């Protein structure tokens, strides 16, 4: 496993055949079977839930990052939050929608990302990230800001490469 994970290494390739956490940062799966949505509306959350159900991933907990979670919780606490049956509203004012996946191996992550790209989100795809040991105890606010900044930087780089 990668014990020497570099904080500056923002993007790592996902090994489709690996049975480990993406980026090989943990042996096996890391974290609960969950997806944290940041910046999604309740309607969009329902669309994502239907998409996961259609993929046979109805066992994955789908969590919406609320303002309280954003301001007070770590990534770990957010991923362990139970919201069944609650109509929750996401953090307002987010420039970039973010999908943070937990408990998945490479092929599963790729399947989720592909499903988003084939859905109504294809023209405004969110930023995708995976929960890894390096960010597990960080405040979710810090993690979201880092992901959002990295995503904006990557989009600028992609735009200038064309």
Question: Where do the protein language model's features map onto the residues?
Answer:
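Short, solvent-exposed interaction modules
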Residues: 83-115
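Glycine-rich, often proline-containing surface loops adjacent to acidic residues and nearby aromatics
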Residues: 30-35, 92-98, 124
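Short, flexible, solvent-exposed loop/turn segments with mixed acidic/basic and small polar residues
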Residues: 20-29, 86-92, 117-120
């Amino acid at each position: 496993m990668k014990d020497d994970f570099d904080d500056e290494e923002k993007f790592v390739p996902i090994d489709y055949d690996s049975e480990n956490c993406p980026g090989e940062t943990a042996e096996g799966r890391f974290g609960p079977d969950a997806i944290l949505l940041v910046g999604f509306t309740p309607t969009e959350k329902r669309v994502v839930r239907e998409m996961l159900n259609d993929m046979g991933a109805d066992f994955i907990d789908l969590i919406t990052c609320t303002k309280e979670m954003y301001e007070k919780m770590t990534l770990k606490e957010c991923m362990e939050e139970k919201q069944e049956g609650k109509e929750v509203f996401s953090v307002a004012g987010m420039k970039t929608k973010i999908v943070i996946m937990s408990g998945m191996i490479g092929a599963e992550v790729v399947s989720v990302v592909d499903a988003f790209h084939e859905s109504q989100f294809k023209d405004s795809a969110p930023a995708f990230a995976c929960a890894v040991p390096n960010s597990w105890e960080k405040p979710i606010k810090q993690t979201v800001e880092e992901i959002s900044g990295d995503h904006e930087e990557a989009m600028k780089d992609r735009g200038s490469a064309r």
